[in-house]
């Protein structure tokens, strides 16, 4: 009970409510405990697998496909007002679906039976440690894994030479969790290229107008595949290197050397025919969304290709 003097003959008494403070602390402790338990339960629920794919992947896929379905009814009106804005919204949804599919495929294939069960791994540890003790090696190898290299400093022979399957490192399957950062970056890339995609289609339709129809289509396809595709693919790898992966000039050079030419070759196997159909059949206001819709499969491949090591 502290006393505070304000002047002559004036005393103010403050009563400390210690019980209330303790109650508040207990309440906060209980609340924090329940919050942690709820978060853990939610994580467990979202990591539940349906057909080998987590509930998180399924939920996001359903939400984005439903949003795309509802968006289609408003596309014409949006395109009439602004072609860029309509393309922007379309790309965000389609690129989001592409990466969800890519991560779902990776999640599906990450779920398989370990070729070396844990009980065999533990047994191998036990036998190896006992042999080290008998040889006077003590327990220095307690921290070693069955998949470590047991080679001595001056020998090229390993105990695993007779068991090559033990040389494979134990994979840490991180593909069973959804990578929201990668997903967001992929949608941002779709958002970014919308500012170039819509004007590019307008340019092609405006520039090639006097020749017969088939000739116009071939000219547009060649212009698209020889100019737009190589540049946009290179820019995508730059974006993924610097933004998504935090790389530098050296990592970009390695990525381009390892992935660019082969990916561009795959592009030329798919997109010339797609764009020929696009420019020949589709109305002009549906050319961009048509290519983006077909691009769901391509972007899914591109996302997996970029994530490959």
From Swiss-Prot:
Glycans are attached at residues 19, 121. The keyword Glycoprotein applies. Residues 74-81, 205-225, 282-309 are cytoplasmic. Its main location: membrane. Residues 1-52, 103-183, 247-260 are vacuolar. GO terms for cellular component: cytoplasm; fungal-type vacuole; mitochondrion; vacuolar membrane. It is a multi-pass membrane protein. It holds the Pfam family Mpv17_PMP22. PANTHER family: PEROXISOMAL MEMBRANE PROTEIN 2, PXMP2 MPV17 (PTHR11266), VACUOLAR MEMBRANE PROTEIN YOR292C (PTHR11266:SF50). This is Vacuolar membrane protein YOR292C. It comes from Saccharomyces cerevisiae (strain ATCC 204508 / S288c) (Baker's yeast). The lineage of its organism: Eukaryota, Fungi, Dikarya, Ascomycota, Saccharomycotina.
